[in-house]
Amino acid sequence: MLSRLLPFLVTISSLSLEFIAYGTELPSPSYVWFEARFFQHILHWKPIPNQSESTYYEVALKQYGNSTWNDIHICRKAQALSCDLTTFTLDLYHRSYGYRARVRAVDNSQYSNWTTTETRFTVDEVILTVDSVTLKAMDGIIYGTIHPPRPTITPAGDEYEQVFKDLRVYKISIRKFSELKNATKRVKQETFTLTVPIGVRKFCVKVLPRLESRINKAEWSEEQCLLITTEQYFTVTNLSILVISMLLFCGILVCLVLQWYIRHPGKLPTVLVFKKPHDFFPANPLCPETPDAIHIVDLEVFPKVSLELRDSVLHGSTDSGFGSGKPSLQTEESQFLLPGSHPQIQGTLGKEESPGLQATCGDNTDSGICLQEPGLHSSMGPAWKQQLGYTHQDQDDSDVNLVQNSPGQPKYTQDASALGHVCLLEPKAPEEKDQVMVTFQGYQKQTRWKAEAAGPAECLDEEIPLTDAFDPELGVHLQDDLAWPPPALAAGYLKQESQGMASAPPGTPSRQWNQLTEEWSLLGVVSCEDLSIESWRFAHKLDPLDCGAAPGGLLDSLGSNLVTLPLISSLQVEE
């Protein structure tokens, strides 16, 4: 019976030794997994604790759905913790089943238990990556190119674009070199363009690949930085914009220059240009200029000269406003002259004309009025008297000064404010034709009558032109027996106004001048036949005129509506 138990004991002992040799003397790896990228399939495991220098690991691989494990002998390296299984899994991207793998530790004759991957290794386990990114700046735009992974072990037709044909997406991140904040952009192809940010000279770009139809993990590519230099700003676009701007500026400048040239007067032809003569001073100039002599008036000699000028022929009423005591005969033509067509008037003038009644002009001023005194012609008819019984001596109201009559003679003075520049003469010879009344404005030259050379009749014939006429509405009548003397004129100028009136000397004391209540027109034309001696009279007396008449009424007054001259009261006369 003992012989029967011996073979059984030997078999049990051998089994126990074999169990000890391949048993759990070594711990197994705790975790095994695949870490794969495109055509880079790496199997990783964790090492066992307290491993020695002689410890190594064995790896077995099988396809999913197959029971046979294939040992991978290239992975038996000392202390290695990973093994590249790419060559054993090249068909991974064409088969959907995947692979499984297991790992154990070996130390001399001791072995550990197998540790298998927890999940099946498929395409979804592949991590998506980008091999590199290329950036190029041109015309102010950044052109980027994404390079997918191109492993050398990749079989023909299994490129990244062929394996992942659809739904490829790339996420692009752009940031300044000195900042952490970035901007992202998504593209669906391996090329992209970026605009250079304003004020950015250096920036960095990185790309993250994605597949919209899978859940693969992805890794950012290596960041690529680009430094934009000054030369890169001079691109074709920038140069084109610069050239166009310069052309526009030059065009505007040319237009402005042309406009200025057109408005600017051109150069005259040489034939029309007269050169300025050179200044030369001849020894004997043809027309030497004589400077105006200015003489200082000697105040001591001046009174003597004034006395001499009083007795000279030049004494008279002039524009200077200075007068003398010597009587001056006024020979200036009257502003308003009666037409001499009436024969009775002419006859009366011829008979009554004598040097008895002549006036003296003393202290006459710019008003040009010469008032006469009958002292020089006493043989004439009735004397002129003041109407109100008083005389104006050296009147300054209108710069008209009157000289008193000689004692025993009637006085006649006229106020320049009332009479102005008006002198009225009687008509002349009947053979003269009717003349139209003419109105003068300004100054008329006055000439002096010389009583010694000619008689009063000759002076009237030569010096009194009949140029003016009365208005027909005036109704002035002169009686036939009226004989009134001609006014004495003084040398000088008589101021004329645009509108003025003339007064005629009176005749006999019983005859008077009458004036109608209506205003008589100075511009009217009257015929000499309508005038008669009986019509030369005035009807109304006007006190403000301050004009005197002899008793009996040679001249009562003039109308209040007569146009008077402006008062000139700025000059003063010594006498």
From Swiss-Prot:
Segments in the Cytoplasmic topological domain: 263-575
Gene Ontology molecular function terms on file: interleukin-10 receptor activity
Membrane topology value: Single-pass type I membrane protein
Keyword Amino-acid biosynthesis assigned: no
A biological process term (GO) from this entry: interleukin-10-mediated signaling pathway
GO cellular component: apical plasma membrane; cilium; cytosol; nucleoplasm
Post-translational modification, as annotated: Phosphorylated. Phosphorylation of the cytoplasmic tail induced STAT3 activation.
Subcellular location: Cell membrane; Cytoplasm
Keywords (A to Z) from UniProt: Cell membrane, Cytoplasm, Disulfide bond, Glycoprotein, Membrane, Phosphoprotein, Receptor, Signal, Transmembrane, Transmembrane helix, Ubl conjugation
Cystine pairs: C204-C225
Positions carrying Phosphotyrosine: Y443, Y493
Database matches in InterPro entries: FN3_dom, FN3_sf, Ig-like_fold, Type-II_Cytokine-TF_Rcpt
Ranges annotated as spanning the membrane: 242-262
Residues linked to a glycan: N50, N66, N113, N182, N238
Pfam families in the record: Tissue_fac (PF01108)
Task of the protein: Cell surface receptor for the cytokine IL10 that participates in IL10-mediated anti-inflammatory functions, limiting excessive tissue disruption caused by inflammation. Upon binding to IL10, induces a conformational change in IL10RB, allowing IL10RB to bind IL10 as well. In turn, the heterotetrameric assembly complex, composed of two subunits of IL10RA and IL10RB, activates the kinases JAK1 and TYK2 that are constitutively associated with IL10RA and IL10RB respectively.
Assembly notes: Interacts with IL10. Interacts with IL10RB. Interacts (via its cytoplasmic domain) with JAK1 (via N-terminus). Interacts with BTRC; this interaction leads to IL10RA ubiquitination and subsequent degradation. Interacts with STAT3.
Family of this protein: Belongs to the type II cytokine receptor family.
Record's protein name: Interleukin-10 receptor subunit alpha
Species annotation: Mus musculus (Mouse)
Lineage: Eukaryota, Metazoa, Chordata, Craniata, Vertebrata
Gene behind this protein: Il10ra
